[in-house]
UniProtKB/Swiss-Prot annotation:
This is Probable exopolygalacturonase B. Specific in hydrolyzing the terminal glycosidic bond of polygalacturonic acid and oligogalacturonates. The keyword Glycoprotein applies. GO terms for molecular function: galacturan 1,4-alpha-galacturonidase activity; polygalacturonase activity. Disulfide bonds join 256-273, 391-397. Keywords: Cell wall biogenesis/degradation, Disulfide bond, Glycoprotein, Glycosidase, Hydrolase, Repeat, Secreted, Signal. It comes from Aspergillus terreus (strain NIH 2624 / FGSC A1156). It catalyses: [(1->4)-alpha-D-galacturonosyl](n) + H2O = alpha-D-galacturonate + [(1->4)-alpha-D-galacturonosyl](n-1). Its EC number is 3.2.1.67. One of its GO terms (biological process) is cell wall organization.
Length: 435
């Protein structure tokens, strides 16, 4: 029996309307969705909170980091920091906000980081997982961020200078900050805001519990066609219990939603993704001798447009990798349009060639997975194949079920579902990759 059912969660607004959008282009949401994204004003749950304001920046080099830290400290323990509409607040110094307890931040203006690459590469919070860094870290308990404003990562310079490089290259030393990070935080909610142009991942939750995002719009775009945003995932997590994303739109060049190792109790509802690498479980199993898990995820009412992947499970293979499990995952009501691989189990991650994957297969077990009511069209890049589920010979893949799959390919019909190494009946006709 699945850990999650839709009845366990409050009903949300109906699924988003779908527009035809060019990958990588800026997206202006439809009017009804725009209203969903900027609802901060009615999220006043504590109207009697004391309100703290700080001075705004005079220009893009007027750093108000000290003022922001002062305001956060004053609003802590029951107050609210108000960042006013029509005003800009420039942050040019790293901030340790790990001391928070019962605080609201009402972001109606623009909170913008400087693009001083040399400074940020020397002054940041570092996480060994995939060599991640951040501008700041938020920690503590009962933290609420809401409003109609913008959290701006000012990523263009980062995109320009990182062009041609890869985040997972062992020789990479050009680290780029993550826009929003929680560490050792409990009960964090973010509502209504826009997150714009993160230099790297947009959100990363570390060692945190009960994190929720609702009615958020995430976008990363470049004004330089030869330096597109890279690795600007919408959501990433590490050692997290309780992660909820609802009524949210994501227009980035990498994973739309991608919990990383040891993330459990996941709920996603009404998520719209354009130009992404999909709604992915993982990657996990990257580090030698380390056991990773992702389990108990319920994902429903998702639209995936113009991307590389749709519903994806990904695990590392190779000579020096780890092991673990992806377990108890449900994808339900998933709309696919112009997507290369609508449903995919990738156990040859990251960029592992066929020979190496065969010699050093993944040791991540894949169990209790449901894909239900997945419909739409692939891009045709993989020919007639619309689902590719090939299990590693070094792993157990069992209780994997597909139901109500209505996927087509512009490459022709009938559509093809590939399955190999999976124990039991998957519920639909499938064939081996060598057929």
């Amino acid at each position: 029996m699945k850990f999650f059912t839709a009845a366990l969660f409050a009903s949300a607004v109906s699924a988003f309307a779908v527009d035809s959008i060019i990958p990588g282009a800026r997206v202006i949401p439809a009017t009804d969705t725009l209203e969903l994204q900027h609802v901060g004003a009615h999220h006043h749950k504590h109207p009697n909170r004391r309100t703290v304001t700080i001075r705004s920046s005079r220009n893009d080099t007027d750093d108000v980091s000290k003022d922001f830290l002062w305001g956060i400290s004053r609003a802590n323990h029951g107050g609210r920091l108000l960042l006013q509409k029509g005003k800009k607040y420039v942050i040019g110094k790293k901030l340790d906000l790990s001391f928070l307890n019962n605080i609201e931040v009402q972001l109606d203006g623009e909170l913008k980081f400087t693009d001083d690459v040399p400074y940020w590469q020397k002054n940041n919070f570092y996480y060994s997982f995939q060599k991640s860094i951040s501008f700041w870290r938020w920690g503590g308990q009962d933290i609420k961020i809401f409003g109609s404003g913008v959290l701006n990562g000012n990523g263009q310079r980062w995109y320009n200078e990182f062009a041609g490089q890869e985040i997972l290259d062992p020789d990479n030393t050009f680290y780029r900050p993550i826009l929003f990070v929680t560490e050792n935080a409990t009960r964090v909610s973010v509502e209504g805001i826009t997150q714009l142009n993160s230099p790297c991942w947009t959100n990363f939750f570390v060692g945190s519990n009960d994190v929720s995002f609702d009615n958020v719009y995430i976008e990363a775009f470049s004004t330089n066609a030869s330096a597109l945003p890279k690795n600007t995932d919408g959501f990433d997590s590490y050692n997290v219990k309780g992660l909820s994303v609802t009524n949210t739109r994501v227009n980035v060049g990498d994973d739309c939603f991608s919990p990383k190792p040891n993330t459990t109790d996941i709920f996603v509802q009404n998520l719209w993704c354009n130009g992404t690498h999909g709604v992915s479980m993982g990657s996990i199993g990257q580090y030698p001798g380390v056991m990773d898990i992702i389990e108990h995820a319920y994902i429903e009412n998702v639209t995936l447009l113009n991307g590389q992947n749709g519903a994806r499970l990904k695990a590392w293979a190779g000579e020096n990798v780890g092991y673990g499990r992806i377990n108890n995952i449900t994808y339900k009501n998933i709309r696919i349009e112009n997507t290369d691989k609508p449903v995919v189990l990738d156990q040859c991650y990251f960029n592992v060639d066929t020979a190496t994957c065969a010699e050093y297969p993944s040791s991540v077990n894949i169990t209790n997975i449901t894909f239900e009511n997945v419909y739409g069209t692939s891009s045709g890049k993989e020919g007639k194949v619309v689902a590719d589920l090939v299990c590693s010979p070094n792993a157990v893949c069992s209780d994997i079920h597909l139901a109500d799959i209505d996927l087509t390919s512009p490459a022709g019909s009938p559509p093809v579902i590939i399955c190999e190494g999976i124990q039991g009946d998957i519920g639909v006709e499938c064939q081996s990759s060598t057929s």
